[in-house]
Regions:
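Cytosolic catalytic domains that perform sulfur/thiol-centered chemistry
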Residues: 1-278
């Protein structure tokens, strides 16, 4: 059970630390259509982490898939990230894309990576300064190195094999309507439903407003799922919100965790795979 979340007060006190690097993981396209309260500003000194392009596998037809380790390391160094860097990630929705970036550095072996609980909303509403989100500058090349944790990223073949082995329990972070197949998918070429034997924990059920629920509330949620001794693989539409519930689980549990990188977009658009509807 890790110390993953930091407060605006903690971050403000750290601003003068030379090892601190703040990563703005906000999506420029806002594909999800989430409400953005504070546009065009960022936390002073924040560096834009381009999750949609630079830090996704552009050879894949799927959104947000993990880039090669080599590319991840190269682009991290371009952002000036070092092995000793203290990384704090936030986004402009509250908690949305930032857990994905936290997870990426976590599984690449970086120890000091945190999420600003509540994101830019909490920062501004606690009275801390912002700056205009200008174009990115160039940074001194960092020395970041990393090694992708074995079994942290699940492929389509891994999930197909798991249908028989049942080594991992799949937890789907999509809304109940999408999971049950009663609501349409945002990508019209993706079928409705869910992977057989997966369970549903909509990501907004671990949040209260723009922040994570308390640890006591999260403990109750995960206890109700009866998953204490299971290895867990997290699924969503495209690998973003799965990381929200993965992070929530790591605040209160000690399961082995992974993310199905292609998530429902891959499963629901691949012919011949079994699909359940509840």
């Amino acid at each position: 059970m890790e110390n993953i979340l930091v407060s605006p007060e903690w971050l403000n006190e750290k601003l003068s630390d030379p090892n601190l690097i703040i990563l703005d993981a906000s999506e420029k396209s806002n594909v999800a259509g989430k409400k953005i309260k504070y546009e065009g500003v960022r936390i002073p000194g924040a560096r834009f982490f381009d999750l949609e392009n630079t830090f996704s596998d552009k050879s894949s037809h799927l959104p947000h898939t993990f880039p090669s380790s080599e590319n991840f390391i190269k682009e991290s160094r371009q952002l000036g990230i070092n092995n000793k860097s203290i990384l704090v990630v936030y986004d402009n929705i509250g908690v949305y894309t930032s857990p994905r970036v936290w997870w990426m550095y976590k599984v690449m072996g970086h120890k000091q990576v945190y999420v600003l609980d509540g994101g830019l909303n909490e920062w501004v509403e606690n009275g801390f300064k912002t700056e205009v989100a200008a174009s990115e500058g160039e940074y001194q090349i960092g020395d970041f190195s990393g090694d992708l944790e074995k079994n942290a990223v699940d492929s389509l073949e891994d999930i197909k094999a798991n249908l028989l082995s049942k080594k991992k329990l799949l937890i789907d972070a999509r809304t109940r309507g999408r999971f049950n197949g009663t609501s349409p998918e945002p990508r019209d070429w993706v079928k409705n439903g869910h992977i057989p034997a997966s369970i549903n924990l909509p990501f907004d059920e671990v949040l209260k407003g723009s922040k994570f629920k308390s640890r006591e509330e999260l403990k109750a949620i995960f206890k109700s799922l009866d998953i204490e001794d299971r290895d867990l693989s997290f699924v969503c539409g495209s690998g973003l919100t799965s990381c929200i519930i993965l992070l929530a689980s790591e605040l209160v549990q000690q399961n082995k965790t992974s993310v199905y990188d292609g998530s429902w977009t891959e499963w629901g658009s691949t012919d011949g795979l079994p699909i359940d509807h509840d």
